[in-house]
Amino acid sequence: MVNPYRDELEGDYKIRTFSEDVSENELIWHRDRNDREITVVEGAGWQLQMDNKLPEDLQKGKLYNINKMEFHRLIKGEGTLKIKIWEK
């Protein structure tokens, strides 16, 4: 399976880019192997939904914590989404 994003390493973090052309069907529920902190660099209207919670609008500059092995997914917004990811 091909990932619906592109990663670029930038020192101690990576920039993950989701194209505006990504299909909503590719943005599946999943779990990560490590704890992560993310923040939005670019994008509007995208949402993060954690397991058993309502979707939350992603706000540029706000820090979001994602615990390892916790189910979550992105919900597509408008345009491209770029997030900065720190693995813990």
Task: Walk through the language-model features, giving the residues of each.
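Ligand-binding loop in jelly-roll beta-barrel domains
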Residues: 67-88
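Short strand-coil-strand connectors
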Residues: 49-52, 77
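Short Gly/Pro-enriched loop/turn and capping motifs at secondary-structure junctions
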Residues: 23, 44-46, 71-72
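Double-stranded beta-helix
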Residues: 3-18, 82-88
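A structural signal for the main folded, soluble domain(s) of proteins
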Residues: 28-29, 34-35, 60, 70-75
